């Protein structure tokens, strides 16, 4: 991998955007994965702009991204993009930094190692099979809501060995309202529309439960609902200990059981939320794209019939479902749940001759990178074969569905295994077509979601 240093030739001059334009659109539009606010960043590998007095650099060349996430990673930390996550889930693997992050990540790595995850396949399959069995042939339903409930049941069963109860039914509404409020809060912090001290104080108030007025009160109420739910899960385990090697027991026994209760709560809530939200979105986009591409779907159904027939999948089957896996990878390229990430420079840096001053927020528009024709020929075409051909000249940071660098999502193997199982089990019994009159609309909050769901009709095979 080539490095992004001053010794390499420039890929081109930095594009500069109007401060007034970017500030106005940050206030009025917010995030937009398409042609709006971030759409203006297309057409250049590096773009400089200011927003309400804060410096930003957007980088969309994989070499530049590689530099920030790998080569010069010690010069960059998580930005205010993660403020709403801190407000809800406190200090955790998503929001922590430095030695504390490394220590906590190390304590949890073995839980998400492939050899351990293979033993969770049965625990993943049970809730997926239950949801599939409850589907009504010919009935129209919102696949996104179904995926939220399914992925939450999988997380509850496989990682917590518990039933989340009523939270499963209410999570779709909680997540939708919470993410929309979080996007507005993030807009104030990330784009510099509010002084950082004020922003950080609001984050602390939401997290600590200090009474706040609307609309912050709604986000706080959602946080308190989730707080009660996850504390109930922890209390139940403490009252009725088990010998299972699930995530909750790992959290409670980490470092000899000396993690503070609040840290256990924060990590458990993070895995509950992040463990279902991004996967639910990824699966919703998968079913949407498969409905639009019947040839790819038919190829997948043939593979499933050949490998599985109608029997229950096993861990050994997962590696045999190459086309199914490629379809999931391509859908994550086309609509990446994690569609943008940001880092803040804590030291001066140089990227390919471009100076990055300390305090600059570096934006990585994953959605744009995933649709760059230099790395993905004919990028608007759904082509799972890209992931079977695997050209050797594609940069490693041209594909970032789980982020990259040492901060890459710890649960990526868990998520991929879960997605393959969902695609396989549900497709053994049903095909899903878009409901008449349905049109998708993207909603770019902290994650990329279908704004009005994905309305489908399931037809029994």
Curated annotation (Swiss-Prot):
Question: Which cofactor names does the annotation list?
Answer: heme
| SUPFAM superfamilies named among the record's database cross-references | Cytochrome P450
EC id? 1.14.-.-
What broad class of enzyme is this?
oxidoreductase
Molecular function terms, GO-annotated: heme binding; iron ion binding; monooxygenase activity; oxidoreductase activity, acting on paired donors, with incorporation or reduction of molecular oxygen
Q: Which residues bind heme?
A: 409
Quote the Pfam families the UniProt record gives: p450
Q: Which UniProt keywords apply?
A: Heme, Iron, Metal-binding, Monooxygenase, Oxidoreductase
Q: Where is the signal peptide?
A: none
| InterPro entries per UniProt | Cyt_P450, Cyt_P450_CS, Cyt_P450_E_grp-I, Cyt_P450_sf, Cytochrome_P450_Monoox
Similarity section: Belongs to the cytochrome P450 family.
- Name of the protein in its database record: Putative cytochrome P450 132
Species assigned in the record:
Mycobacterium bovis (strain ATCC BAA-935 / AF2122/97)
